[in-house]
Amino acid sequence: MHPKRLTQQYHRLYQHFSGQEVDTQLQQLADIACCTRRHMRNVLNGMQQLGWLKWQAQAGRGGRSRLRFCCKPESLRRDSAASLLGQGKVEQALEVLDHDKQALATILLQQLGQHWRNNRQVLSIPYYRALPSLYPGTDLRRSERHLVRQIHSGLTVMNEEKGEVEADVAHHWHQHSSLEWHFHLRPCVRWHDGRLLSVDDVKDSLLRLRQLPLFSHIRTVQALTPRCISIVLNEEDARLPTLLADSAALLLPSNHAQNPEFASHPIGCGPYKVMANDDLHLSLQAFDDYFGYRALLDEIDIWILPELGVEQSSEQQSTKGLEVQVSPVASAEQAYAIEAEQGCYFVLFDSRSAPLRSQVLRQQLSHLLSPLLLIQHIPLDVRQYWTVASSLLPQWFHLRQQHEVVGVPAHGTLSLNLAFPEDQPDYPAIAQAIQDCLAAAQIEVSCHSISFTDWQQGLGGFDMYLGSVNFTSDIDYAIPAWLLGTPLVRNAAFDAHNHQATDLHSEWRRGVLDAGNLTAYVLSQHTLLPLFHNRLRLQVSDGMQDLKLNALGWFDFKSAWHR
């Protein structure tokens, strides 16, 4: 019998007899359960085998038998749901709990962390929001940028520890001429659906990138042989192998656009394949036919538990965005890996906005929103891991090198609109602090929570944008790629009429402009104001091995394992 149906029958019997031990007859129980005597006998045997009740049957049709209940229905439902979750049967567990997600979250708390399931190593991780899009080349947040690298592969890959580009699907490459590169492909690379990766898959994946600013200089992509791709550029780019290690350049099947569910259930050729992805959990399974070293962890379950944030303290809520918990239940065997993030919170003054076209006003606003002043308006439990920023990176000090004399905005009515991405716990507190600081200068700020896609694209006609960014280990690539490749930053920070972004992009590709100089220039225009640096935190238990915190606040799934 279906677990939910069996628990319903038990609940019906328990309610009828108020949980009391009774002498009864099989026919009476069959009438209560609305079934035949034969079926009722099977139901009682099943419940007794599970330890739910004791049934001492008496011989003869008229004999009275003794029924004793061994557990309460609420406890039974929890145990049944826990058993189903242990088997990976999420929907059935939710049905048993009458779709009570809070009850599901309570049970999951006891099952998070490392465990075994059917002789397979499983790691269950809590997360505070759903992950509906794992589509490379689209607008991806920090965690999604990490996850797509676990699911997909590219021609090249960045070794985060060394800060060097390494081979991935392409085992070798070379620069054939100043504008042409050749990449040699591994044989027998398979997609998660079992199909072999073809040279056409690679070609189509690269051609679709040309719509993005970072890849707009790709002129043609041709297959020289079934295992060799030629990429011809419009302008020189010595960083092309690094560019192709970007999460946007991960390879996709040629027919992926025909799958309406590809964003949530993508087909890749990376170490893990997506087994389930909904508002309850993301389930990843190690891909046995992966062309590299097979992942050590067999399954990764990421449970979407926004309910946990409600129950935890405000300190824990405010830092959830930069903390990955392998197990949220405290124990003496757990430890934290903590590192300063290579990135920051920032506010962007959109130079396309009518009032903010004035560099003088942007400069005055930057002065009013000095990180040292702003942080005093943010509750201590929110900012306990923060330090004030002097540039995009904690080791840079561009703002301290600026010594301009600034005034204050002219008296009068000035109203500005501030937008920030939804579903991020820290932003409302920072937005409130910005409101407070500017209100002291008689500037009214209206705050708006918008979708990440709208924020990333700079949609909505807002004057200011609050956000955060984390950079990978190759800073000379990552920072210019973000400044010049993110639609919001590119359009808001640079003068479109003078093709400023295009010119700076060309200088960077040629190696004339580096990350430090480009950052110094952007900050000198007062369109971008770094605010605070946070700390990336990874809570781990003693049984987990080789969990190394990366620049995105996560860890490489395929290298981790547990004893």
For the regions a language model picked out, list residue spans one by one.
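N-terminal lobe/hinge region of extracytoplasmic solute-binding protein
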Residues: 125-176
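Detector for C-terminal structural segments
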Residues: 58, 364, 368-405, 425-433, ...
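Surface-exposed binding/hinge segments that line
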Residues: 214-260, 267-281
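A bilobed periplasmic-binding-protein/Venus flytrap-type ligand-binding module shared by bacterial periplasmic
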Residues: 285-288, 339-364, 368, 377, ...
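Ligand-site clamp/hinge motif
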Residues: 289-332
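Ligand/substrate-recognition segments at binding pockets and active sites
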Residues: 19-28, 33-39, 51-57, 407-469
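A structural "hinge/loop" feature
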Residues: 130-144, 240-246, 539-558
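Aromatic- and charge-enriched surface segment that lines or borders ligand/interaction sites
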Residues: 18-22, 41-43, 140-142, 147, ...
